[in-house]
Amino acid sequence: MKLIVGLGNPGREYERHRHNIGFMVVEALLSRARAQLNQEKFAAKVGQGTLAGERVLFVEPQTFMNLSGRSVAEAARFFKVPVADVLVIHDELDLPLGRLQLKAGGGSGGHNGLKSIVSSLGDESFIRLRFGIGKPEGPNARERVSDYVLSNFDDGERREMDALIDRAMDMTELWIREGLSVAMNRFNRKA
């Protein structure tokens, strides 16, 4: 069994925010798997399905981003999913919009959701699908990060979203079918 986690903030007001791209990808994967988030446990919405021939547990933590580790750790422990079979899909400021990257382990890069997961799992070696959202530019860019991640994609960016989410789903399915190295070699080089 694989555990696929989409990071985001709960609530309709956050639904289309850049910070919620993890939820958006999980929703698309659920459609591909003909599954749904039909349970509430581990302080998360949870559903099971089959993707690329493998049983998958889908999780969308319903805590806010900085507490999402609790949901991930509880689900992984309950279903006895090894950390190497946990994929966390999250927004990534350090990648430009349109760039997707798979990687195993690493630090949190300042991402509070990842910090929480690392702390709760006690292990940073889980797989990440980093979905580039770009970052604010210009004067006071650092101070504007919070407003930026909690903003909606603009019209031009929204037009790109379907293709990017499709690519994220393809990356996820290849990771399930053929492993991380194959998926990284195929997709991480593409812009």
Curated annotation (Swiss-Prot):
Active site: which residues? 19
Report the EC code(s) recorded for this entry: 3.1.1.29
At the top of the EC hierarchy, this enzyme's class is hydrolase
| Keywords associated with the record | Cytoplasm, Hydrolase, RNA-binding, tRNA-binding
| Amino-acid positions noted as binding tRNA in the UniProt annotation, renumbered to this chain | 14, 64, 66, 112
**GO BP terms, alphabetized:** protein quality control for misfolded or incompletely synthesized proteins; rescue of stalled ribosome
| Localization, UniProt | Cytoplasm
Q: Which parts of the sequence are marked as the site Discriminates between blocked and unblocked aminoacyl-tRNA? A: 9
Location (main, coarse): cytoplasm
A cellular component term from Gene Ontology for this protein is: cytoplasm
Q: Catalytic activity annotated for this protein?
A: an N-acyl-L-alpha-aminoacyl-tRNA + H2O = an N-acyl-L-amino acid + a tRNA + H(+)
Among Pfam families, the record links this protein to: Pept_tRNA_hydro
Q: What protein name applies here?
A: Peptidyl-tRNA hydrolase
- Lineage of the source organism? Bacteria, Pseudomonadati, Myxococcota, Myxococcia, Myxococcales
